[in-house]
Amino acid sequence: MGLLSIPYQSKSKLWIAIFLVVWSLISMHFIWQSQANSGLILKNELSSTSSIPHEFEMLIDTNYPKFKPTSGHSGSQTYSNLFKNQDRNAAIFTILKNFDLEQRCQLYFKNVKNDKLIVDPDHDFKFDRFDYLNWDEYRDESIKRLKGDNDEFVATSSDLDTIKKNFDKAKSRIASDLQLLHDYFSHIKIYNQCYIDRNTSFIKKQHELIDGLNWKTSFKRSSFLSGKQIVTEQQMYPWLSQKSPEYNCLATGQTTKFAANKNSFLNTLKNNLNGKGIVMTIADAHIDYCIRLIHLLRYLKNTLPIQIIYTSNDLSAESKSQLHQASVSDFDGLPQQNITLVNVTPAIKPQYLHKFNEFGNKILAILFNTFEEMIFIDADAILIENPEKFFQLTKYKNSGALFFRDRNTSEYRPDHDIEMFLKLMNSQYDEIIFGLLQITEKTMSIPLFDRKISHVMESGLVLLNRKVHFSQPLIMANMNFFEPIRERVYGDKEMFWLSLSIIGDENYQFNSHPAAAIGQLTTYQERVKTFENPPSSFKSQEICANHPAHISDEDNHTLLWFNSGFQFCNQLEKVNYEDEFSHKERYSQFDTIDKFKTFWQSSLVIESAIIPPENTNSNGGDGYEPSVSWKHMEPYCAGYTWCAYSSIGNGDQANDRGLVINYSPEEIEHFKKLGEIWMRGYNYL
């Protein structure tokens, strides 16, 4: 019987029933889609299926093996949300085969809980090394604190219960804080990959890897993915004002800014990078060093433009005028310098400017200069060669990032420092889904991880290709914000290379040699003064100095640069001359305090250099030879003097022997002339 033959009243009821069924189906569809949009239901997107064989997991683990030192970390909580109630193999296969980068980004950020997306730069993390002690150490130290000066104090069972509760609470908070930091850094890195770096070459390789694999899943083309960017730059970088710094050319007096569309500030900055140049950051306190460096650059016939980064309250009008005069006033007919002052204050929201005090200014200098290739120089650094030559160093040309090592001293980090740094590294999922590479043995071979050495990098001079490593200062900034990270490094030094490893960018190089001592070799007579029965000679040689210096690993001879100015002691305002003169362990050739004072204030004389051994200490030797590669001569130059040794112990092992370099008369004369230029007086009003 056809529909037309049904009585009118019955037909009416039937149409109503049909309408209700259709309405229910439509409603269910929209409810499902709404849930999918919030990341709650991904069943049809990343469906569980028994048709994905175990061989696929083997294929993934072969091509993306978990790196053992970081494999024990849980990874981002977002991945747990994403794969919840899903078969991991089916989900990953679906993503690799069907999702482009934009869809992967949306999938990730839809699974981030809103309250876990951002950690405010002012987030009050508690960091106390006491909380990282093991139970026995924590208990004993807690009892000691309770005891105080009361020798008769005995801890009760109630005291011990309280101590145990505090211990457990501290460990729980540490685990929670580290997971929060890990997840936040994951969000930052993935955002940068999605919307700034946009490297998609890894996806093409994945398609080639699974080409021909057509395992069936119930995947439906990403209907919940809108094509609209879910997370904005303003959300991810709340400390950026989205406004341009002010670039003031001293030669013309012209101030310029760049225009950026809303939420594309960083892309605009990146796209405007061009050329090579020198970058510095100073405040009024550094103006003397900076003027002397400008004089030195003029003598070296520098032609690279210079950008000096500062914040509004740090550099006075008088200092700006002095910089201008130092760059253009007649100076032995030497070339003028092209200097631009960069006021970065407008680019940072006022409430976050304090996060970039002191060492943090260097991060702003790396981020806001406009050079594609930059050489960052501390105001008190001394260049021996024309800056252009640094860009020709092989390791820089091969990687676009060249760093220099610090003194190889025997100072070490606790295990929990190492564990925290490793916690920030990329996971296997980061590499599979976003092409963010896991670290390799290259990172683990760096002395911080390999030997737990505290000081790896000396950051007075840094070479960086900004376009190749654009995200680096963004990660550095976030490292600098948070106390559990900031308190584990000294200033900015280790952040330069750690930030790159955290991104998964191991395309950076270190000059092979650790920092050297430069000056004059200590005489035999000076060294034997402290021995009751001195040896007839020493295997090792010694230089005591206040200036970390850097020798090229291309010829194991050329002095490239050193830090701490050209004055023999760069801490004169802190020196107690009578006290330092009274110590006779070194510098005993000066028989009056006036001679001692004159030497302290004079230009450094460079005749030789010692690169100490790679090993920091040795138990071998006959008691006369040094057991450490560097000895801290704390009584001198307000604690800044270190003595370097060419060998330690018996010097029988290769890593117990360093390198002694004796410079030619021509080289010594060049160093002398540089010292004269740097030490020369000036009067810029």
UniProtKB/Swiss-Prot annotation:
Where is it located? Golgi apparatus membrane
Q: Which domain of life is it from?
A: Eukaryota
InterPro entries found in the cross-reference section:
Alpha_mannosyltransferase, Nucleotide-diphossugar_trans
Stretches of the chain found on the membrane's Cytoplasmic side: 1-13
Glycosylated residues, per the record, are N199, N338, N408, N556
Q: What is its EC number?
A: 2.4.1.-
**Glycoprotein as a keyword?**
yes
Its keywords, alphabetically, are: Glycoprotein, Glycosyltransferase, Golgi apparatus, Membrane, Signal-anchor, Transferase, Transmembrane, Transmembrane helix, Virulence
TM spans (from-to):
14-34
Q: What family classification does the UniProt entry report for this protein?
A: Belongs to the MNN1/MNT family.
* Task performed by this protein: Responsible for addition of the terminal mannose residues to the outer chain of core N-linked polysaccharides and to O-linked mannotriose. Implicated in late Golgi modifications. Involved in virulence.
Name of protein? Putative alpha-1,3-mannosyltransferase MNN14
Give the source species.
Candida albicans (strain SC5314 / ATCC MYA-2876)
Name of the gene this protein is made from: MNN14
